[in-house]
Amino acid sequence: MEHHWGLITGNKEKVPLKSISVTLSINDFVAAVAATLHYENEEKVPIEAMFVFPMDEDSAVYSFEALVDGKKIVAELQDKTKAHSKYEEALSQGHQAYLLEEDDYSRDVFSCNVGNLQPGTKVAVTLRYVQELPLESDGALRYLLPAVLNPRYQLSEQSASSCLNVQKPIVPLEALPYTLSMVATITSQHGIERVQSNCSLSPIQYLTDDKTSAQVSLTEGHKFDRDVELLIYYREVHSPSVAVEKGMQDKKRDSLMGAPCAMVSFYPDIPEVNASKVCGEFVFLMDRSGSMQTPMRTEENSQLRIEAAKETLLLLLKSLPMGCYFNIYGFGSSYEQFFPESVKYTQETIEEAVERVKRLDADLGGTEILTPLRNIYKTSSIPGHPLQLFVFTDGEVSDTYSVIREVKLNSKKHRCFSFGIGQGASTSLIKNIARVSGGTAEFITGKDRMQAKALGSLKLALQCALDDISLSWELPPGLSVNMLSPEQPTIFRGQRLIIYAQLTGPMPQAESRGAVCLKHTLQGKSLENKVAFSLQPKENANFTIHRLAAKFLIQTKDLGSHEVSKEEKKDVMNISLQSGVLSSFTAFVAINKELNKPVQGPLAHRVIPRPMIATSTSMFMRSCSRLTGPFKNSRLKRRLCAADYVPYGHESTVYSSMPSPAPIENQGVADSSNEKSNSQNEHKAFGENVVLQLIFLQNANGSWKLDENLTKILGTTLEDTKAANPSQHGDPSAWATILAVLWLHANGQDLKCEWELLERKAVAWLHDHAGRGTTPPPFPSFHLHPREPCLYVLQRTQESLWLSQLCCLRTLSLQLILHFQD
């Protein structure tokens, strides 16, 4: 009987990757990360280890090195074609070789190859990168270390050269054969209020009395079976800031990396505006591929993605303003649309749309988003109704560049709000289609509710944004600014503006200060934010600001090797090689020439297993015979296609979980019992949620009809409800609408962010229609806030008995009617 010792995969192969250690340094709004992969070959033959992993597409990878038997081997960034050739040649000569590259078809997927790893050899491979930290809606900065890489569907014309084509072993999450350790140091002039995480962390340690520096770490033995998320809350996040960084001494003074570089950050506190009567064309593009049958989480009774998507569509439809236009597309291998073209928002069209939403299913096969996108863009625009596109997908598309390019080509006539569903959604796809069109991107993971995220973005779409944005600089004579970031025409409420610029000319010797002024308009009113800063550049060994600026320039020009011109490719190559930041045209390669053992036969190839979110749809990749391009006959390409891509069956289905963030200040471990109870109470099948049933009944204009369907939800009879109406001769819909709004406050408070917009529409309708032609009798006087019409009743009634005190409701309703008449 054969025995397998050590860590093995489900295929009985020993795993060369033993652990991953991450050192994270967060300074204000940016993060510097060093990730070390520890390999050991326990086999009796030389091997080549390949590790395919996801990384946020905004990450600027700038360093790759290996430590072998105490010797450091630093990789060089080269043209990708040359790097591949050098790697292959080194292996053929018996040298040890290392290769790190970005995938040809997706900017957020990387592969790390360790070639000719001799028996008994231990190697530590370290890659370093920097990135901007995105903002959450509540002002938190979010750092995400992604663990899950979903299977990605391939476009028909795609080459098999992608590392996504590699058959990656799947193992049960609890048996994942490597661990993760992470230490995070956080420093901010804004002051650190608290830190939260979805994983078990050590108690937070403040390193300074003023709480401007802190440290946290993952608890020992953490399995890399879920995305690791940190949420950092600063005390004064809206304060503008400017940081100036010294350039490299060995670079030309006026070059990208030689000149001082400034990063300007504005996070304006834009007031919320009631925008219930906003014109626009709202198109919702919903993923209906087989992967949408995947549960949102692994907990028992977790809601399916498609069910959450249907609820989300319903809430979005009910929250749209009267007078707008809308349409809904579903896409998979093919696509369907509700209407031939966008229709006006009326009671008839909304009723038809709601009925069709109820019948939606994840039944359209694979993921092909380009065709419906092109159909949307070729449709004639509606005068006076700018297009707002909402895209929902789990991101399982390989060729993200083609999709991004299509959105960018049409960016001047629309905004795109994108949503990545589940762990493993492509950050490259989701972020870039929003970025190039001036919209926003959201990721729905762990216990995030798709409904809440989508309604939050709709609020942004309905809000008045900052327009006519311009920057002006106040600098000493002789010093000028070269803007590296293009102009951003608008800033939405909750968005942050980060700008990169070069300072050219002689820097002042003595202490001197400059200033930046951001001018903009809000609803026709001119406003400005001004911040002063020191002109003495600070040294930074990582050159974080310079490399983030270089990454920004690369992102604006690099749409993949198959989508850019020769001139654009040349520009990207120059920026990448000058800054040391990885691009789709470059790769890191390192050779250990001290090892000179000729390889006898092919190296044993080992692909490191990852936690995978399997789908219910079979996915097939092209065979190796269809390879094209400069690597057609290379050994690396032959390795990538050693086996056809095997569809995942039910027997290998593994889901990754992500519990809700738990505060770690004063505690290190989240309460698992609370998580369990929350997950059990949260899920309802589509249509079973009573709050949703009430929302189903709302009319397009925001009102509710007084009928038995409504009173059944309210827990009373139609006769009793009519008898309790304080305005017997008025419109009964006013009474029904008041009761519906009160019921939502009493019974759906935990989901308020999801029905807040449709409540505003209801209140606006009451303001225009309630109490016409009525003369209400005297009633007790009390203060009523127009934004909180139910507080009086809620203070006097219990949730389960709220309709039993109809006299209070009558009194409140009379006050409401008078208030709206005024």
UniProtKB/Swiss-Prot annotation:
Q: Does the keyword Metal-binding apply?
A: no
Positions of transmembrane segments: none
SMART domains assigned: VIT (SM00609), VWA (SM00327)
Key word Iron present in the record?
Answer: no
What stretch or stretches form a coiled coil here? Answer: none
Entries under Pfam families matching the protein: VIT (PF08487), VWA_3 (PF13768)
Residues of the VIT domain: 1-131
Task: Cite the entry's keywords alphabetically.
Answer: Tumor suppressor
Q: Which domain of life is it from?
A: Eukaryota
Which segments constitute the VWFA domain?
A: 281-469
* Polar residues: compositionally biased ranges: 669-680
Task: Quote the Gene3D superfamilies the UniProt record gives.
Answer: von Willebrand factor, type A domain
Which region ranges are annotated with the description Disordered?
657-682
Described by its record, this protein's role is as follows:
May play a role in tumorigenesis as a tumor suppressor. Altered expression of this protein and disruption of the molecular pathway it is involved in may contribute directly to or modify tumorigenesis.
Q: What is this protein called?
A: von Willebrand factor A domain-containing protein 5A
Gene name, per UniProt, is: Vwa5a
